[in-house]
Design a protein with these regions (language model features):
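Active-site beta3 strand of CheY-like receiver
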Residues: 44-50, 55
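The short loop immediately C-terminal to the conserved phospho-acceptor aspartate in CheY-like receiver
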Residues: 10, 53-54, 79
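Charged docking surfaces used in two-component/phosphorelay signaling
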Residues: 15-23
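C-terminal output helix
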Residues: 87, 104-112
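The feature encodes the CheY-like receiver
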Residues: 14, 56, 70, 81, ...
Length: 112
């Protein structure tokens, strides 16, 4: 069962993604910020990370750069945002993100 780490500061987004992914048979971990994501990443490498771009304290792009610089970007990361620009999405893929999902994220978009 693939382990997916969902990192988003919005509780509603975390809960929605948790329900969709769990119902599809995935092992889902939730993190509300970069600090919690770091701890989850240290506890064990997920098979996939869904990472919000805009979060308080440390944003998703900064965390992605950190993982890349530390040699910890050895799992696919899909960035998520409802406010990101094309430039932000391009920057994320240059750093190493696999893809970009625009919020709101529905079941079809997530599982497609």
């Amino acid at each position: 069962m693939p382990k997916i780490l969902v990192v988003d500061d919005e509780v509603g987004i975390r809960e929605l993604l948790f329900e969709i992914l769990r119902d599809e048979g995935h092992d889902v971990q939730l993190a509300e910020n970069a600090a919690a994501a770091r701890a989850a990443r240290e506890a064990g490498r997920p098979d996939l990370v869904l990472l919000d771009i805009w979060m308080p304290d440390t944003d998703g792009i900064t965390l992605l750069k950190e993982w890349s610089g530390n040699g910890q970007l050895n799992m696919p990361v899909v960035m998520m945002s409802g406010h990101a620009t094309i430039d932000t999405a391009v920057e994320a893929t240059r750093i190493g993100a696999l893809d970009f999902l625009e919020k709101p994220i529905g079941m079809q978009k997530l599982l497609g």
